[in-house]
């Protein structure tokens, strides 16, 4: 489980995606490498985890042999908002000190079962995640903050600028119906 920098445990917020990369590096070096020894390591990352995996591969090119990135969050989609509009909104939110406020349409966790309006296409997967959240309070992360969005945009720019630093084979998988992550950014 991750520590929360805010009292609302359902709020997804981070100063920098480098925090996630540091956590992953500590896990890999302190647990995985000690347990697995010199065996080849393969990295799998999905969505936001795919962005974290890409950052990790760029910053630690010697650790993994191969990787799979599934719908990696190399670039987020913002509905009808242009990138310029998103930057303007994030700037205003920063000036108003809304960093740890929920983004529009983002909300705290509720235990309401609502597969139909979720971003999930698999009911079995939704049911599994729903059960985990009901049973364990620390799984109840739900809504992103302005701070998280800003950190995500910065991470996306870094990933694209430094993609050539990934030297291992990477299988890139995309979800045709994904409306949260841009498929075009993975090319």
Task: Name every feature range the model reports, one short phrase each.
Residues 48, 52-140:
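Alpha/beta-hydrolase-fold enzymes
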């Amino acid at each position: 489980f991750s520590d929360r920098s805010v009292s609302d445990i359902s709020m997804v917020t981070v100063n920098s995606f480098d925090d996630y990369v540091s956590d992953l590096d500590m896990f890999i070096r302190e647990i995985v490498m000690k347990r697995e020894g010199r065996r080849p390591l393969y990295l799998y990352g999905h969505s936001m985890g795919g962005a974290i995996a890409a950052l990790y591969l760029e910053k630690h090119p010697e650790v993994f042999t191969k990787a799979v990135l599934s719908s990696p969050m190399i670039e987020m989609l913002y509905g009808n908002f242009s990138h310029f509009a998103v930057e303007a909104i994030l700037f205003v939110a920063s000036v108003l000190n809304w960093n740890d406020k929920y983004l529009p349409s983002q909300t705290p966790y509720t235990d309401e079962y609502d597969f139909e309006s979720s971003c999930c296409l698999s009911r079995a997967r939704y049911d599994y995640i729903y059960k985990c959240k009901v049973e364990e309070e620390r799984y109840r992360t739900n809504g992103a903050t302005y701070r998280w969005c800003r950190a995500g945009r910065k991470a996306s720019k870094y990933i694209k600028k430094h993609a050539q630093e990934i030297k291992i084979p990477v299988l890139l998988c995309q979800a045709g119906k994904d409306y949260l992550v841009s498929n075009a950014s993975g090319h």
